[in-house]
Amino acid sequence: MTTILTSTFRNLSTTSKWALRFSVRPLSCSSQVQSAPAVQTKSKKTLAKPNLKNIVVVEGVRIPFLLSGTSYKDLMPHDLARAALSGLLYRTNIPKDVVDYIIFGTVIQEVKTSNVAREAALGAGFSDKTPAHTVTMACISSNQAMTTAVGLIASGQCDVVVAGGVELMSDVPIRHSRNMRKMMLDLNKAKTLAQRLSLLTKFRLNFLSPELPAVAEFSTNETMGHSADRLAAAFAVSRMEQDKYALRSHSLAKKAQDEGHLSDIVPFKVPGKDTVSKDNGIRPSSLEQMAKLKPAFIKPYGTVTAANSSFLTDGASAMLIMSEDRALAMGYKPKAYLRDFIYVSQDPKDQLLLGPTYATPKVLEKAGLTMNDIDAFEFHEAFSGQILANFKAMDSDWFAQNYMGRKTKVGAPPLEKFNIWGGSLSLGHPFGATGCRLVMAAANRLRKDGGQYALVAACAAGGQGHAMIVEAYPK
């Protein structure tokens, strides 16, 4: 695969053998926004399993997702996480001391609050007797928080768990250089003035150069944007297709926002500023305007631009997960069941963003479902090219047989069921918080349209991925 992808991108004017296989059927992502047809209610089996607890989502919320450098720029990550937790408490009226455990996902750690889950929980007024821990798994960090909660409840360790995620891209940690850090530590250990002066003679001006957070994959030294560009080229996804898909995402998000479908948002009164009540990254444009943008990563021939990529985002989400018995005993009407889930990983060099392709057939088999059983799809949109490349891979028998060891393709999701309230391209992508947003969008869509099953999937740095089946709770 490495050879195929590398040769494909070295000469974009020449279509590789792999690209040829994926250039036959273009994907239609019309810029015209159309209402998705109502889900046809079908009599389906439940995925409840004998002798296993039913685990439910009672409610999930998020503060508005904002472009980094805007209204949240003067805050810390635990401020955002605390706001999401406070919103969940307000929305559910759950007694704080009933919560057994709190788990939050995050990617870029704030050194002052290394366990942001605990600090946010204390700030939101939860009992100091309630344990909390933080997990990190790149863009599926809050997915990991949710499934960890499922495990705690399924094993009988807990009945009530809050899971969530947070990311603040407005203020990422910037360190001193390694040489400067070593000198500062040595100076701190020095016992005499002579020792300190001796150390200072080794100082060089380049020690003052800051060490910025890594944007490239550690194992491959390639940015995700570069990977997205190569993936789009290998799967013959054109710039026009990518721009059309991005426009679709923004247009659908704007429509959902105007029609009140983004009901998981809770307003946040930013200290010293106005109350924020809606996402601010939704920007329907035109294909003509988008076409003017230059490639963002591989120049001059790349196809990934600022318009067809997700943007740096600040935000937080939180979800109340309970055993069904406990939820009903407390008088709650759950929104959905959390059913089967799976994590996958593959080559981070050439399959970095193909997590949904690998995870989807596995989770469907685990649940005993097919693509036709799914009423709502919610996939994380890192890049337009990533989504469309996954579609082509999922819809290819050749790819399934040669790279996945499967006899047949799983099939691509139908667009009329796919991310119809927008996605990460338009709503934003706070790395640690997106997973909870995906699950709540899936649950709310099932509830609104009368569907029974939703499939949530996401890719993540390191060549990892996740998929989960969400089942509607009976009305």
UniProtKB/Swiss-Prot annotation:
Catalytic activity: an acyl-CoA + acetyl-CoA = a 3-oxoacyl-CoA + CoA; butanoyl-CoA + acetyl-CoA = 3-oxohexanoyl-CoA + CoA; hexanoyl-CoA + acetyl-CoA = 3-oxooctanoyl-CoA + CoA; octanoyl-CoA + acetyl-CoA = 3-oxodecanoyl-CoA + CoA
EC number: 2.3.1.155, 2.3.1.16
Matches recorded under InterPro entries: Thiolase, Thiolase-like, Thiolase_acyl_enz_int_AS, Thiolase_AS, Thiolase_C, Thiolase_CS, Thiolase_N
GO CC annotation: endoplasmic reticulum; mitochondrial fatty acid beta-oxidation multienzyme complex; mitochondrial inner membrane; mitochondrial nucleoid; mitochondrial outer membrane; mitochondrion; nucleoplasm
UniProt entry keywords in alphabetical sequence: Acetylation, Acyltransferase, Endoplasmic reticulum, Fatty acid metabolism, Lipid metabolism, Membrane, Mitochondrion, Mitochondrion inner membrane, Mitochondrion outer membrane, Transferase, Transit peptide
Top enzyme category: transferase
Transit peptide endpoints, chain numbering: 1-34
Increases nucleophilicity of active site Cys (site feature) positions: 429
Catalytic residues in the record: 139 (acyl-thioester intermediate), 459 (proton donor/acceptor)
GO MF term list: acetyl-CoA C-acetyltransferase activity; acetyl-CoA C-acyltransferase activity; acetyl-CoA C-myristoyltransferase activity; lncRNA binding; protein-containing complex binding
Intramembrane residue numbers: 174-221
Subcellular localization(s) per the UniProt record: Mitochondrion; Mitochondrion inner membrane; Mitochondrion outer membrane; Endoplasmic reticulum
A biological-process GO annotation: fatty acid beta-oxidation
Sites of N6-acetyllysine modification: 73, 189, 294, 299, 333, 349, 362
Residue positions, PTM N6-succinyllysine: 53, 73, 189, 191, 273, 292, 294, 333
Known pathway: Lipid metabolism; fatty acid beta-oxidation
Predominant place of localization: mitochondrion
Known function: Mitochondrial trifunctional enzyme catalyzes the last three of the four reactions of the mitochondrial beta-oxidation pathway. The mitochondrial beta-oxidation pathway is the major energy-producing process in tissues and is performed through four consecutive reactions breaking down fatty acids into acetyl-CoA. Among the enzymes involved in this pathway, the trifunctional enzyme exhibits specificity for long-chain fatty acids.
Similarity field: Belongs to the thiolase-like superfamily. Thiolase family.
Record note on quaternary structure: Heterotetramer of 2 alpha/HADHA and 2 beta/HADHB subunits; forms the mitochondrial trifunctional enzyme. Also purified as higher order heterooligomers including a 4 alpha/HADHA and 4 beta/HADHB heterooligomer which physiological significance remains unclear. The mitochondrial trifunctional enzyme interacts with MTLN. Interacts with RSAD2/viperin.
Record-given protein name: Trifunctional enzyme subunit beta, mitochondrial
